[in-house]
């Protein structure tokens, strides 16, 4: 958000100061989660020079055209609003309550499925970003099992993928 308000500048300066790392930092403020997510995807694509973005079943990301492409649920959000932006690929969510192998195997099995699908169907070298809600609210308040998010983060780091 480009604005001449000192309060915005102060918040961005505080974010930069509190964010770990010694490199040059920039902060941006947006008016909605959808706008923030669209910009995160643009930044990831520009930074990685890749186009593919991985999202998950049951996810809700917003009501803009780009975030509707990322949203899993057709009704009531997407019906009649297409065509949507390309290069979004949906993966199964680690959903302990409904995972076929049961909750105790969910993290490991779901991570294996997601990584296999990315590596074999997309190619990790094509993926700019993986977008995951830490707790999916719209999908039924799905809390991924311990180890799933950490495993995705490690996969992203290994392959130069931005984890949003």
State where each predicted segment sits:
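Glycine-rich loop-to-alpha-helix module at the N-terminal edge of alpha/beta enzyme cores
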Residues: 1-51, 62
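Short coil/turn connectors at secondary-structure junctions
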Residues: 22-25, 48-52, 84-87, 125-127, ...
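Conserved residues at the C-terminal ends of beta-strands
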Residues: 30, 56, 133
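Generic enzyme active-site microenvironment
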Residues: 40, 131, 163-164
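A glycine- and small-aliphatic-rich helix-loop capping segment at beta-alpha/alpha-beta transitions
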Residues: 45-49, 69-78, 147-151
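PLP-dependent aminotransferase-class I/II
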Residues: 60-135, 143
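Catalytic PLP-binding core of fold-type I/II PLP enzymes
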Residues: 111, 124, 142-164
């Amino acid at each position: 958000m480009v604005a001449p308000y000192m309060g915005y500048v102060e918040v961005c300066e505080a974010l930069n100061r509190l964010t770990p790392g010694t490199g040059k930092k920039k902060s941006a403020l947006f008016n909605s989660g959808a706008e923030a997510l669209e910009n995160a995807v643009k930044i990831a694509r520009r930074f990685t020079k890749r186009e593919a973005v991985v999202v998950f079943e049951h996810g809700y990301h917003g009501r803009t055209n780009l975030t509707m492409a990322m949203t899993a649920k057709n009704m009531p959000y997407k019906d009649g609003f297409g065509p949507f932006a390309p290069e979004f690929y949906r993966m199964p969510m680690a959903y302990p309550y409904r995972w076929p192998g049961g909750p105790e195997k969910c993290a490991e099995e779901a991570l294996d499925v997601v990584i296999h699908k990315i590596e074999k169907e997309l190619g990790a070298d094509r993926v700019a970003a993986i977008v995951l809600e830490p707790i999916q609210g719209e999908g039924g308040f799905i809390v991924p099992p311990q180890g799933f998010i950490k495993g995705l983060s490690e996969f992203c780091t290994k392959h130069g993928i931005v984890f949003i």
